[in-house]
Amino acid sequence: MVLSQRQRDELNRAIADYLRSNGYEEAYSTFKKEAELDMNEELDKKYAGLLEKKWTSVIRLQKKVMELESKLNEAKEEITLGGPVAQKRDPKEWIPRPPERYALSGHRSPVTRVIFHPVFSVMVTSSEDATIKVWDYEAGDFERTLKGHTDSVQDISFDQTGKLLASCSADMTIKLWDFQGFECIRTMHGHDHNVSSVAIMPNGDHIVSASRDKTIKMWEVATGYCVKTFTGHREWVRMVRPNQDGSLIASCSNDQTVRVWVATSKECKAELREHEHVVECIAWAPDTAHPTILEATSSESKKNGKSGPFLLSGSRDKTIKMWDISTGMCLMTLVGHDNWVRGVLVHPGGRFIVSCADDKTLRIWDYKNKRCMKTLCAHEHFVTSLDMHQTAPYVVTGSVDQTVKVWECR
């Protein structure tokens, strides 16, 4: 591109102003002479700082162009996948779309967990600020704060009715809350270190918890007594999750393993060992996903004749793995995140996996084709947790940036 005489003159004056104002006197004199510039103080005022302004605006434009190119590529990809001409898309294929519907502020420290209520249009979040907050996700309104823990609240879990909420904390306790009266009805002591994870069993009679003390404990809801302790992990147990019928309990740990336990006998049914770093998160695949999983992994699954249940794990090695618990085999490894994977779940429709990570993204995976089909830049800092509503078209994410975001799916 050739500059006109006027543009050339303006550029030369802007360069001269930059050299002079930054103290490059010798270069300024030489340049002024070479460019045959007649510097006029009044005239040159309008060129003050012009070069820096142009430079920053070029960078800004480049960034915008890159963003637009990325969106264009996403759109092309979706068209290739038969994507979202999707006002008519089947709810089983709803996926979160940017931008977020709400970005909710209120926590004063990183958000550690986000979960939807199983019945009402509310969600609950926990934070390192030692509080639990309740929000209306449809209206984007804050409703109330539950206080009681004296240190970071690490995890929260509803029972299937949504009447009880369990929470656990770095204060080494587990609390049970009446979610109708928003009161703490029981505090359980027994772990010797930070309690990192909690889950109410599907029957609602027991709670399981995992701790940095390397143990998993089972507690009776009615009495608050510890009735079982599961030992075997060699390091901090990061997360614990029961399967759909409560017969199995999965756990993951800093020892880089995932273990599956028989709930009644405490027997370790499987020890899954292929991750190369701390395993941060786990999630059971719902029954609705089994046909797609079997189709996607037919060769691996059919070798043994029996298959399932299936478990997902996410690790600091940046990968997500899918396991067949009947055989202990890793069926697939999904690679794409650029940092620690912090949350993972199977889409309620059974066809996709949704994950979040310290690379600040939310990703949707078409696991049948073992590829990431959509990446959302979700937060300005690490994304610590996500949840997807079982029936309504919403995903929620929480972050170290102290915000909670609600994403609409379509």
Swiss-Prot record:
Main location: cytoplasm
GO biological process per UniProt: cell differentiation; cell division; establishment of mitotic spindle orientation; microtubule sliding; nervous system development; reelin-mediated signaling pathway
CDD domains to which the protein is assigned, alphabetical: WD40
Keywords carried by this UniProt record: Cell cycle, Cell division, Coiled coil, Cytoplasm, Cytoskeleton, Developmental protein, Differentiation, Microtubule, Mitosis, Neurogenesis, Repeat, Transport, WD repeat
Gene3D superfamilies: 1.20.960.30, YVTN repeat-like/Quinoprotein amine dehydrogenase
One cellular-component annotation, GO: microtubule associated complex
Residues in LisH domain copies: 7-39
Keyword Repressor listed: no
Coiled-coil ranges from the UniProt annotation: 56-82
Superkingdom, taxonomy of origin: Eukaryota
Cysteine-cysteine disulfides: none
WD repeat start and end residues: 106-147, 148-187, 190-229, 232-271, 274-333, 336-375, 378-410
InterPro entries: Dynein_regulator_LIS1, G-protein_beta_WD-40_rep, LIS1_N, LisH, PAC1-like_LisH-like_dom, WD40/YVTN_repeat-like_dom_sf, WD40_repeat_CS, WD40_repeat_dom_sf
GO molecular function, one term: dynein complex binding
The keyword Nuclease is annotated on this UniProt entry: no
Annotated compartments: Cytoplasm, Cytoskeleton; Cytoplasm, Cytoskeleton, Microtubule organizing center, Centrosome
Family: Belongs to the WD repeat LIS1/nudF family.
Cross-referenced HAMAP family: lis1
Known partners and oligomeric status: Can self-associate. Component of the cytosolic PAF-AH (I) heterotetrameric enzyme, which is composed of PAFAH1B1 (beta), PAFAH1B2 (alpha2) and PAFAH1B3 (alpha1) subunits. The catalytic activity of the enzyme resides in the alpha1 (PAFAH1B3) and alpha2 (PAFAH1B2) subunits, whereas the beta subunit (PAFAH1B1) has regulatory activity. Trimer formation is not essential for the catalytic activity. Interacts with dynein, dynactin, nde1 and ndel1.
Domain remarks in the Swiss-Prot or TrEMBL record: Dimerization mediated by the LisH domain may be required to activate dynein.
Primary role: Regulatory subunit (beta subunit) of the cytosolic type I platelet-activating factor (PAF) acetylhydrolase (PAF-AH (I)), an enzyme that catalyzes the hydrolyze of the acetyl group at the sn-2 position of PAF and its analogs and participates in PAF inactivation. Regulates the PAF-AH (I) activity in a catalytic dimer composition-dependent manner. Positively regulates the activity of the minus-end directed microtubule motor protein dynein. May enhance dynein-mediated microtubule sliding by targeting dynein to the microtubule plus end.
Protein's UniProt name: Lissencephaly-1 homolog B
Species this chain originates from: Salmo salar (Atlantic salmon)
